[in-house]
């Protein structure tokens, strides 16, 4: 009896992160991306955000838009928002928010996503 026929076919990594290809066509990717000198000064109600989206490149192109789970870390207690039009096949985009206004922050986005490779 075979318990799981959805075996890992290939796995690897590059500068953009790690990936696994599964037999059923699922593509799993994960990693982190550091952003230096992030300007978080655009007001949004009682918070602040970056004036442009942060681009997070994926380690491998997906055949479909990816589904992303991500979080942010930094001294300004940041969080992120990934808009639906920020999802792609080669990267995803995120707005970085904070309750603290800052002209120069170092933020790391930790992420995991799923797409397809076939």
Give a label for each model feature.
Residues 1-30, 34-37:
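Glycine-rich, low-complexity segments
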Residues 26-118:
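Extracellular attachment/recognition segments
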